[in-house]
A protein has these predicted regions:
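Glycine/Thr-rich beta-alpha phosphate-binding loop at enzyme active sites
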Residues: 113-130, 160, 167-229, 263
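Glycine-rich phosphate-binding active-site loops on the catalytic face of alpha/beta enzymes
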Residues: 41-47, 108-114, 167-181, 236-238, ...
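C-terminal helical cap(s) of enzyme catalytic domains, especially alpha/beta-barrels
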Residues: 49-61, 181-201, 247, 259-284
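Active-site beta->alpha loop and helix N-cap motifs at the rims of alpha/beta catalytic domains
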Residues: 57-128
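Ferredoxin-like iron-sulfur electron-transfer modules
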Residues: 302-321, 334-337
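Iron-sulfur cluster-binding cysteine motifs and their immediate structural context
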Residues: 246, 324-337
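N-terminal capping/small domains of soluble enzymes
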Residues: 1-89
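Catalytic cores of alpha/beta
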Residues: 25-31, 89-100, 154-167, 220-227, ...
Length: 337
């Protein structure tokens, strides 16, 4: 399962993504001991920001000394710093300071949707000109591999992605969480999380966003100007099959947060064993050999076969007589049944 990402040799493709699951030495070392290959630890800024409480909801930098310690204690693991600045000087300063700490690479956060100030996070990722300016600022402070984390809150990720690469980014990551409002109460008229009776537009994550992440990864992988640019897929991975999607669509790295929050670091066992089993039964020697294999199969809607007709099929062994197939086909399938 070993694979290279940004010229960094990784024992497997699976990293903790930039979030609370990788915010201190103890948490990250535990994950490393369990088999995770690397971490993009919680975004570091040069400005103070207060968290609200509660800040989560479900649906029905020089103070980070542990980065150098991690590299000393786990030399075979990959440690990446996520950074976010308010202006060009901030980005340059953060890049320079984190480079001194001995990390392996930098990830620039152009995609977080729930910022307390304008001009940060996803506001940057939506604007190719800002992406260009800030990537160049980071480059002035570091020669480490640079990963630009792109936002899903755009019609097309391609323009900002091209801007990032042209400005000096070595790799691209997608996606971050998606702007949303969830669970609006009919009693309080507030969505969740409810903070003193109010809510705000926040970031939606979890397995439901995975197909959206697949599309953004494909858009970048299929763009000629981004050919051979390493891709990191993040968004909705819960099991090895989800991870396989990203690999087949061109990713050489996979980042995970929400599934860890739900099930713990132990999900690495399923990710590794499932992917190994897939490679074994398909007689594939290395995970590198499947990267991008699905790209030729994705075509424009106008290129799909219009002659073939599929007819309803039934698995009588699994049928329990609930009648849902009849309802779906009769009420929503042109009365196929």
């Amino acid at each position: 399962l070993s694979i290279d990402f940004c010229d960094l040799h990784c024992e497997n493709p699976f990293f903790l993504s930039s979030s609370v699951v990788g915010s201190n030495y103890e948490m990250i070392s535990k994950a490393f001991d369990m088999g995770w290959a690397g971490v993009v630890y919680k975004t570091i800024t040069s400005f103070a920001h207060e968290e609200v409480s509660p800040r989560f909801a479900t649906t029905p930098g020089t103070h980070h000394g542990f980065d150098g310690r991690l590299k000393k204690d786990y030399p075979g693991k990959i440690v990446i710093a996520s950074i976010m600045g308010q202006n060009e000087d901030d980005w340059t300063f953060l890049a320079r300071e984190l480079t001194k700490a001995g990390i392996d690479a930098l990830e620039c956060n152009f995609s977080c949707p729930h910022m307390a100030y304008d001009g940060l996070g996803t506001d940057v990722g939506e604007d190719p000109a800002l992406v260009d300016r800030y990537v160049r600022a980071i480059r002035r402070g570091s020669n480490l591999p640079l990963i630009a984390k792109m936002t899903a809150n755009v019609t097309s990720v391609v323009p900002p992605a091209i801007a990032a690469v042209n400005a000096g980014a070595d790799a691209l990551a997608a996606i971050n969480t998606i702007k949303s409002i969830v669970n609006v109460s009919g009693d309080t008229f507030s969505g969740e999380p409810c903070v003193s009776g109010k809510t705000a537009v926040g970031g939606y994550s979890g397995n439901a966003v995975h197909p959206i992440a697949n599309r953004f990864v494909y858009d970048m992988a299929a763009t000629p100007q981004l050919k051979n640019i390493p891709l990191s897929g993040t968004g909705g991975v819960e099991n090895w099959q989800d991870a396989l999607d990203f690999l087949l669509l061109g990713c050489t790295n996979i980042q995970i947060t929400t599934a860890i929050m739900q099930y713990g670091y132990r999900i690495i066992d399923d990710l590794l064993s499932g992917l190994k089993h897939y490679l074994k039964i398909h007689h594939i020697s290395n995970v590198r050999d499947i990267v991008g294999k699905a790209l030729p199969q994705v075509v424009g809607a106008d290129a799909l076969d219009r002659e073939t007709i599929c007819y309803p099929k039934f698995n009588h062994k699994q049928c329990i007589g609930c009648g849902r197939c009849y309802i779906s086909c009769y009420d929503g399938g042109h009365q196929a049944l």
